[in-house]
Regions:
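Hydrophobic alpha-helical transmembrane segments of membrane proteins
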Residues: 1-90, 100-260
Length: 260
């Protein structure tokens, strides 16, 4: 399968890198940092329901959290700027006898299957266990976790689309700015954003099929747009030149230039 072959080649490329030993130490630090934040998110997920119960006595804690889902998605969107886009990863495979569109599609599948899409569950699962389980049981917690994962996958494809367009032309930065500005206005001055977010979150907890289908449709649409955009941006990405620092030589050695 092409997906497993590309994954195996990526691991071999990392091992053959001259900086492999140093990269292993860097990976260890990354894993340690990730474990720290995972533990921190679990702690927040366990303690936050108590604060919500005291601060919003007329609402269930999971309703308060669901109203804040757009904020979590925005933070997740910003964090994903640390990852490369598929057009940045496709270069080693262009000489292979494989269709470029097929390569793009496989790399996009990798985007949806990244472990980072599960990272926020360190917060949402403990929170749901404290607040959702008493009303909807373990099934409600599992359904909620599945819905959150699907939202993060959709957010991953949205982030890839924006980053790819932004690398092509800086004017595309107005796309996410405009979208999040509208959400901010709708959230602070009107209630339709928080109302929709609360309704979606509760539908996910209750296992409503339409909620999952709606997110899957968004994922499919974003994946299709990414497939077309990534294909159009391949060669512009390959032709991009990285800025190399210029080495300045000392003036007292200029006389050597005359002798070649």
């Amino acid at each position: 399968m092409l997906l497993t072959e590309i994954r195996r080649n990526q691991k071999l490329a990392a091992k053959r890198n001259p900086m492999y030993d140093r990269n292993r130490f860097a990976k260890f630090l990354i894993y340690l940092f990730t474990a720290f934040w995972a533990a921190y998110l679990i702690l927040i997920g366990v303690t936050l329901p108590i604060a919500f119960e005291e601060g919003f006595p007329t609402m269930e804690p999971y309703d308060v959290l669901n109203a804040c889902l757009p904020g979590f998605l925005f933070i997740d969107f910003l964090l994903r700027f640390l990852f490369p886009t598929p057009t940045q990863q496709i270069k080693p495979y262009l000489l292979l006898p494989i269709k470029k569109q097929q390569l793009i599609n496989v790399l996009l599948v990798q985007v949806g299957l990244k472990a980072f899409n599960l990272f926020w569950l360190f917060f949402f699962v403990p929170f749901a266990a404290m607040t959702v389980e008493r009303f909807y049981g373990v099934t409600g917690v599992v359904c909620y976790a599945l819905g959150i994962w699907l939202l993060m996958v959709a957010n991953a494809y949205w982030s890839v689309l924006v980053r790819t367009l932004q690398r092509r032309h800086i004017v595309w930065v107005l796309l996410p700015v405009g979208c999040y500005a509208l959400l901010a206005v709708g959230g602070f001055f009107y209630s339709y954003v928080s109302d929709f977010s609360m309704a979606l979150g509760e539908a996910l907890i209750q296992g409503k099929i339409w909620a999952y289908l709606g997110i899957l449709v968004v994922i499919a649409l974003l994946a299709f747009l990414n497939s077309r955009v990534q294909m159009a941006c391949i060669y512009s990405e390959l032709n991009r030149r990285e800025k190399m620092p210029q080495v300045k030589y000392s003036g007292r050695y200029r006389f050597l230039n005359t002798s070649g």
